[in-house]
Curated annotation (Swiss-Prot):
It comes from Candida albicans (strain SC5314 / ATCC MYA-2876). Gene3D superfamilies: 6.10.250.2840, FAD/NAD(P)-binding domain (3.50.50.60). Homooctamer. Substrate binds at A83, E104, A105, G112, V177, D212, H227, M305, R315, M316, G317. HAMAP family: THI4. Binds 1 Fe cation per subunit. The keyword Membrane does not apply. Belongs to the THI4 family. During the catalytic reaction, a sulfide is transferred from Cys-210 to a reaction intermediate, generating a dehydroalanine residue. Involved in biosynthesis of the thiamine precursor thiazole. Catalyzes the conversion of NAD and glycine to adenosine diphosphate 5-(2-hydroxyethyl)-4-methylthiazole-2-carboxylic acid (ADT), an adenylated thiazole intermediate. The reaction includes an iron-dependent sulfide transfer from a conserved cysteine residue of the protein to a thiazole intermediate. The enzyme can only undergo a single turnover, which suggests it is a suicide enzyme. May have additional roles in adaptation to various stress conditions and in DNA damage tolerance. Its cofactor is Fe cation. This is Thiamine thiazole synthase. One of its GO terms (biological process) is thiamine biosynthetic process.
Amino acid sequence: MTPPTMLQTAPVESFNLNPKSTQQAINLKSDAKNGKVSFADWNEFKFAPIRESTVSRAMTRRYFADLDKFAESDIVIIGAGSAGLSAAYTLGKNRPDLKIAIIEASVSPGGGCWLGGQLFSAMVLRKPAHLFLDDMGLDYEDEGDYVVVKHAALFMSTLMSKVLQFPNIKLFNATAVEDLITRKDPATNLQRIAGVVVNWAQLDHDTQSCMDPNTINCNVVLSTSGHDGPFGAFTAKRLEQLGRAPRDVTAGFTKPSITTSKLQEPEPISNFQLGGMKGLDMNKAEDAIVKGTREVVPGLVIAGMELAEVDGSNRMGPTFGAMALSGVKAAESVLNVLELRKQQNEACYGAYKG
């Protein structure tokens, strides 16, 4: 049977609805008062003309170009909350040569960092997390052992705007990670993580959709998907399913030694067990999260509150210094193993040729 012929129309980039359209002045500053304020001549105001299909093409062309570009990434970050974006900011500043994809299930990035505790506006960060704010150029009130940002949304919007300006970083929001790509090392017979399985947020496994997903290969995955709740700690929960060891919530996962700075080989996936997050203790929690941020299994770094579910450490409540500095530590951990994991991936299926 002869396949149907595909018909294509030549794209129309733009057309002229108003050939007499001229440049219009909008001045956002005025010293006038008492009814004399005017930022523009609104009687003569008119937007430049555009065809609806031009808008569609402007969006879709760029989005699918990004899908193609980041299908093979150096690093994938799961979750665009405070820890994930802090890591992205640190990675973007230090390695502009790397392709970094951020996957966020929500339409609006930021996680739980748009407010402080109990819907209050101010954000508290214990020192020395103020140094991260200094690097971003963010103002705060210094209260001695801690600092206060006047609104949590100021922190998050500033951080987000800086991350999104990096040309080597792409945020895919409204996109869910529903599984992990694994590789088995023929030399050691151990599995490692080599990418993520993604889908539109409304079509992932939790919706019981039969829609097959898409994939992104990378050398290191950084997971910062948060704690508890139906979408929290996704990667840690999936690792436990991939592991062969029986679940023992009293034992938790093997914690790293914090008395040495020597890079340690992570545990195999087959040994992975969730520790289960403990109750709130601000003083214990923040130190534990930052110090414990690491590559937990080959190819996967876990940071932020997801790590509390892995290690069985305490939650910290409405103090956010550990989220920022766990992101910094995560960026360090990623960069320290990136070349090794890249070499292992290339030995498995060959180097990417794009």
